[in-house]
Design a protein with these regions (language model features):
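Extracytoplasmic/periplasmic solute-binding protein
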Residues: 127-131, 136, 154-200, 206, ...
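Glycine-centered hinge/linker elements that transmit conformational signals in sensory
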Residues: 158-159, 198-227, 257, 266
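Long, aromatic- and glycine/proline-rich binding clefts that accommodate carbohydrate-like moieties
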Residues: 264, 314-364, 368
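Conserved N-terminal structural module of periplasmic/extracytoplasmic solute-binding proteins
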Residues: 3, 10-90, 270-273, 312, ...
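Short helix-initiation/N-cap motifs at beta->coil->alpha
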Residues: 58-67, 86, 152-154, 225-239
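Short, solvent-exposed loop/beta-turn-alpha elements that line the ligand-binding surface or hinge
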Residues: 101-112, 191-210, 268-278, 328-329, ...
Length: 391
């Protein structure tokens, strides 16, 4: 009875508030094919909904978070918006997001990769539905590598053989001082960013071992250049001077003119038997707590994430979608399949509000330990000290 009454209240509330806003407002930061695919999906929603209209507003990604944080409390923000999950903790704590407990159920949740749903949970409440995901995988040059390595030992052996045959070529490259790119090894050695007690764990033994591993690849195995930039990685790989690259799906857009490459899940860390596990970033579709049309907003969210729409975004928008049923085994391309496999071994990037404190100290620690000879334990202990201090 209470549920029926609540739905009746929502319907009445929606009907009254439509006088104040005659259309749903959806904010996004998509461009190109992704924006086109979203627009088409929204028009299909309008055609299927009873008189519901949606106004799409494109907001530059760099300004999105700040603009949203100001607009929602003032009552002039969107009803629904699409954004990366890492700000959910901050926005939920400030009361900007509507939790989906009223609507979400097990059959709905089971549509998606579990890790993508976990990314949208903060303090046991679900705050959005997952649209798409991004993570890292292993790109390799097929003119240099016949078969993707299953373990890090195999990867190192292949890389060393390539270097021995031609010293102008390198085995592996990625931004060495980036925690985002180091995360596969951190997790593969059994480490984590925060402990279960919510304490920074970057100075724990597994984290120290992961940094020592990277330093060995640079200075002892000599398969990674000492100075690595994103531009250098792209240049070396396109010139076929690089065997392996740790990178995300966006890297494909930089490989025009190079068609002899492939991508595979990251290897198992030989020292631990644990797969290298990259961070997982999720683009969720979220509902504003200040929306005057929550029921209609949620209907739009459900529509955008359903299987047929996910298949369309996967094929025409080029997105790695979170809906599992959109992937037909054996029917997709190898690129998509590699990232579909990788998501199952990915670690959701923390959505804690204080996660943002960790990036700069971690970057400094990785730089000091890998490129400047500071002992890994010492560099990571300093990072933890700065994180706890709030620097």
């Amino acid at each position: 009875v209470r549920i029926v009454a609540l739905w009746a209240f929502l319907a009445l509330l929606t009907g009254c508030q439509q006088q104040n806003r005659e259309e749903l407002v959806l904010w996004h930061a998509y461009r190109g094919a992704e924006a086109t695919a979203l627009t088409s999906a929204v028009r299909r929603f309008e055609a299927s909904a009873d008189g519901v209209k949606v106004r799409l507003v494109s907001v530059p990604y760099d300004a999105f978070a700040n603009k949203l944080s100001v607009a929602i409390p003032r009552g002039n923000g969107p009803d629904v918006f699409i954004y990366a999950h890492d700000r959910i903790g901050d926005w939920a704590a400030r009361g900007l997001l509507e939790p989906l407990g009223l609507w979400a159920n097990e059959s709905l949740i089971d549509q998606f990769f579990l890790q993508t749903v976990e990314s949208l949970v903060y303090e046991d409440a679900l705050y959005g539905l997952p649209l798409a995901f991004k993570t890292l995988a292993l790109f390799y040059d097929k003119t240099l590598v016949d078969v993707a390595p299953r373990t890090t030992a195999e990867m190192v052996a292949q890389a060393k053989a390539i270097r021995a045959a031609d010293a102008s070529r390198w085995g592996l490259a990625y931004p060495l001082d980036s925690l985002y790119f180091h995360a596969p090894w951190l997790h593969g050695f059994g480490g984590q960013v925060y402990s279960k007690g919510d304490e920074p764990a970057l100075a724990a033994a597994p984290a120290v071992r992961s940094v020592a591993f990277t330093r060995r690849l640079v200075h002892e195995e000599k398969i990674i250049p000492e100075e690595v930039t994103s531009a250098l990685v792209t240049s070396l790989f396109r010139d076929r001077k690089l065997a392996f690259v740790v990178n995300g799906p966006w890297f494909r857009g930089e490989l025009e003119g190079h068609d002899k490459w492939a991508v595979a899940p990251l290897p198992i860390v030989s020292e631990t038997g644990i797969p290298a596990r990259p961070f997982l970033g999720v683009e969720g579709v979220l509902l504003s707590a200040q929306s005057l049309r929550k029921a209609d907003g949620y209907a739009l969210m459900r529509f955008l994430t359903r299987t047929d729409e996910a298949k369309t975004r996967l094929s025409s928008g080029g997105q790695l979608v979170a809906n599992q049923a959109a992937y037909v085994k054996g029917a997709g391309d190898a690129f998509t399949e590699a990232f579909r496999q990788q998501v199952e071994q990915a670690v959701p990037l923390s959505n804690r509000p204080h996660m943002r404190r960790i990036w700069t100290p971690a970057q400094d620690a990785l730089s000091q330990a890998i490129m400047h000879g500071v002992p890994p334990a010492e560099a990571l202990q300093e990072a933890v000290r700065l994180i706890k201090r709030g620097d």
